[in-house]
Amino acid sequence: MNNAKMWLVVKPTVGIPLFLVACAIASFLVHLMLVLTTGWMGDYYSGSFEAASLVSNATTLLS
């Protein structure tokens, strides 16, 4: 194991929760940016799947 010496510097009781919190924050930020920067994602999350799929299909056909 290459990273075994890391636990000599950082205790596992601190390092593992810190890693999990960092992953959760990164995941939240990715989803937040998707909702803020795309029109269809917000529509999909609000429940209007039909309109979201129509917009997605229209943009695919135009490009």
Swiss-Prot record:
Its main localization is membrane
Which is a Pfam family this sequence falls into? LHC
The record's disulfide annotation reads none
Q: Which UniProt keywords apply?
A: Antenna complex, Bacteriochlorophyll, Cell inner membrane, Cell membrane, Chlorophyll, Chromophore, Light-harvesting polypeptide, Magnesium, Membrane, Metal-binding, Transmembrane, Transmembrane helix
Residue spans, topological domain Periplasmic: 36-63
Q: Which residues form a coiled coil?
A: none
Compartments where located: Cell inner membrane
Parts of the chain on the Cytoplasmic side: 1-14
Its Gene Ontology molecular function terms?
bacteriochlorophyll binding; electron transporter, transferring electrons within the cyclic electron transport pathway of photosynthesis activity; metal ion binding
Q: Where does a bacteriochlorophyll bind?
A: 31
Gene Ontology CC terms? plasma membrane; plasma membrane light-harvesting complex
Q: How does it assemble?
A: The core complex is formed by different alpha and beta chains, binding bacteriochlorophyll molecules, and arranged most probably in tetrameric structures disposed around the reaction center. The non-pigmented gamma chains may constitute additional components.
Q: What does this protein do?
A: Antenna complexes are light-harvesting systems, which transfer the excitation energy to the reaction centers.
- Name of protein: Light-harvesting protein B-800/850 alpha chain
What is the native source organism of this protein?
Answer: Rhodovulum sulfidophilum (Rhodobacter sulfidophilus)
